Amino acid sequence: MGLVDRGWALPERNKTLPMYLKEQGYTTHLIGFQHEAINAYTLGYDTISKRRAEPLHNCHKLNRSYQKFFEIHQNDEKPFYLCMGVSQVHRPFGIWGDPVDPKIVLIPPYLPDNKIVREDLSQFYGAIQGVDTCIGKIIKQLEDFSLRENTLFIYTTDHGEAYPRAKCTLYDPGLKTLLLMSWPGSDILQQNKKFNQMISNIDLLPTLLDLIGAKIPKNVEGKSFLTLLKGESDTFRKEIYSEKSFHEYYDPLRCIRTDEFKFIINFEKSENLYQIGMDIQQDALGKFMLDYIKKTRPNEELYDLDNDPNEKDNLIDDPNYKEIGKELKDKLYKWMKLTADPILKGKIKDLRQESPIRF
């Protein structure tokens, strides 16, 4: 529903990936950032690095911690799970590395092309290059300690980039996340293999359990996409569902996405076409975009992704799309009922604390 440093928490009945892996004989470890719980030990980690790289977790400053970990665990009898959390592509971008030339940056179709946007993107791309360099060093460390061949390396993100119409929205730039998987010693993951099928974040946990031969509990909502990785299937999900309720503010959104269409419900009225996170608002780009998006937001949105991949033309009132809109809306409400979505009972209570906990 919302951020853990603003009053929200995972239900105690929920088991995490580290908990499941411990049951399979893995040791579990965390270095760097997490924001699933106030107390990271409740997530099932055996060890948690105390080293912090302020003001946010910087991959380069944590590099020594990674190297020490691999050195200690290179000859372990038990397999290990290590979560490495970094925030270098989180705002503010400028503190993480050298910006690229603003003249050569690629402008996403959902942003205007001007000096403010180009300068901001140049810092963002610089931060990405910094993380890319750091990941290269981590992979080199795995090789140096003879761990690379038998280690499944996963690089992923929790949401889209921190830009208006991306982060904190259910448009594709906010929903699409990075997922890279590499396992040189396995014949399951082929090098340079790309997949275009839709998957959801909740599918990663059952896939990892499936990869190690563990039984997937019936109460796990995600689906293993191991058959995709093995090339045994070309199809996976026909649709995915997404939601947002709180970030720094209450902004309840729900959506269903298929390969061809997307249907979004905005449960709260807004004078802005879409809301902007505080981290974006505080930068020059955000202040500019607040004026750029002054337009009343519709209650419902429907997009033909084949003909309008940038989600600019809302077809909710187009009679030619009335049938598909109703079909997607019915499916979305069915999913909301299945997941006991509290929005069905009205406005969700705000649990934000007056003094947010920092961790």
Language-model features and meaning:
Residues M1-K294, E300, P309-K337, I343-F359:
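Formylglycine-dependent sulfatase
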Residues L305-N307:
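Extracellular, beta-strand-rich glycan-interacting domains
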